[in-house]
Curated annotation (Swiss-Prot):
Full protein name: MAP kinase-activated protein kinase 2
Reaction(s) catalysed (UniProt annotation): L-seryl-[protein] + ATP = O-phospho-L-seryl-[protein] + ADP + H(+); L-threonyl-[protein] + ATP = O-phospho-L-threonyl-[protein] + ADP + H(+)
Family the UniProt entry places it in: Belongs to the protein kinase superfamily. CAMK Ser/Thr protein kinase family.
Protein source organism: Drosophila melanogaster
Enzyme Commission no: 2.7.11.1
Record note on modification: Phosphorylated and activated by MAP kinase.
């Protein structure tokens, strides 16, 4: 079984000697649920992740523990190795991210209050976390909004990356070949038998940035399928666009950066050093304060977004492309369900207002 290579080793004393656990569920990771716990001496609240002991669980804890010193990665406070009902478990105590998920924070902003400059600052923080990982030859492999959490509800809160359930070292004799991914954020090379590496994280960064800028993903699935042949083809061929009116006022610099991250050829795709040194990221304070429609789009798609998140999660680590069954489909902008729903609402509202005016 994989040992925890970090110099620190799990404590074998009972977790309950130091912490009081609760039934309050804070979230669910790839390999286990997260509940709230409280330190007995300090009364400080923390997040507790419970993992059944396995090679995969130990790899997750090992990699996360190694990088938890980064300001933009959720910090591990303690790790315990305890036994419950004859089953060995790893109990991971982490800082409690009281500010919630990235997109919920954006959605809660007033219409027009979220700007391109704020988007650039968010991307700067996410890229700092990825840069820290990649410089240590670790690929996260599950970059998505649900894994980006704020420390507090305050305006100056820090955004941090969490959930290392799919993380993997990239300097070993093998390269990443296991298709662990979330459909909306999956890189083209992950969909096929080709080997892939840290460049798949850059692709995911591009998709996350796209959604941050407008409130909907560049690639989507048709007919409610977790990942359709058409969606796979759009990802493979890089078929997406920047539709109006949502992208009308977004800077060309932002669009160019997204294009660089979504290049279908991993050898030509930007590296994290290229992304983090890009002027739009590095000098985010100079980015124009153009109002974005992201918050409004997320609110108007509030009913749809949880379904999108579920769709993303359903196909994690389960998809392999069957090339013989691949069907080539042309991109049709109007088929994006998130955009279609929003525009239908706008048309209905305009019709209502027109009728009200006539009356």
């Amino acid at each position: 079984m994989l040992s925890l290579q970090n110099q620190r080793q799990p404590k074998t004393t009972p977790l309950t000697d130091d912490y009081v656990t609760s039934n309050t569920v804070l979230g669910y990771g790839i390999n286990g649920k997260v509940v709230q716990c409280t330190h007995r001496r300090t009364q400080q609240n923390y997040a507790l992740k419970v993992l059944l002991d396995s090679e995969r669980a130990r790899r997750e804890v090992d990699l996360h523990w190694r990088v938890s010193g980064c300001r933009y990665i959720v910090n591990i406070i303690d790790v315990y190795e305890n036994t419950f009902k004859d089953r060995k478990c790893l109990l991971v105590v982490m800082e409690c991210m009281e500010g919630g998920e990235l997109f919920q924070r954006i959605q809660d902003k007033a219409d027009g209050a979220f700007t391109e400059r704020e988007a650039a600052q968010i991307m700067h923080e996410i890229c700092a976390a990825v840069d820290y990982l990649h410089s240590r030859d670790i690929a996260h492999r599950d970059l998505k909004p649900e894994n980006l959490l704020y420390t507090t509800t305050q305006p100056n809160a820090t955004l941090k990356l969490t959930d290392f359930g799919f993380a993997k070292e990239t300097f070993t004799s093998y390269t990443l070949q296991t298709p662990c991914y979330t459909p909306y954020y999956v890189a083209p090379e992950v969909l096929g038998p080709e080997k892939y590496d840290k460049s798949c994280d850059i692709w995911s960064l591009g998709v996350v940035m796209y959604i941050i800028m407008c409130g909907f993903p560049p690639f989507y699935s048709n007919h409610g399928l977790a990942i359709s042949p058409g969606m796979k083809n759009r990802i493979r061929t890089g078929q997406y666009d920047f539709p109006d009116p949502e992208w009308t006022n977004v800077s060309q610099a932002a669009k160019d950066l997204i294009k660089g991250m979504l290049n279908v050829d991993p050898s030509k795709r930007l590296r994290i050093q290229d992304v983090i040194s890009n002027k739009w990221i590095a000098q985010y304070n100079a980015v124009p304060q153009t109002p974005l429609c992201t918050g409004r789009m997320l609110k108007e798609a509030e009913e749809t977004w949880p379904e999108v998140q579920e769709e993303m999660t359903r196909s994690l680590a389960t998809m392999r492309v069957d090339y013989d069954q691949m069907q080539i489909k042309a991109l049709d902008k109007s088929n994006n369900p998130l955009l279609t729903k929003r525009r239908k609402k706008i048309e209905e509202m305009e019709l209502y207002m027109a009728n009200a005016t006539r009356n």
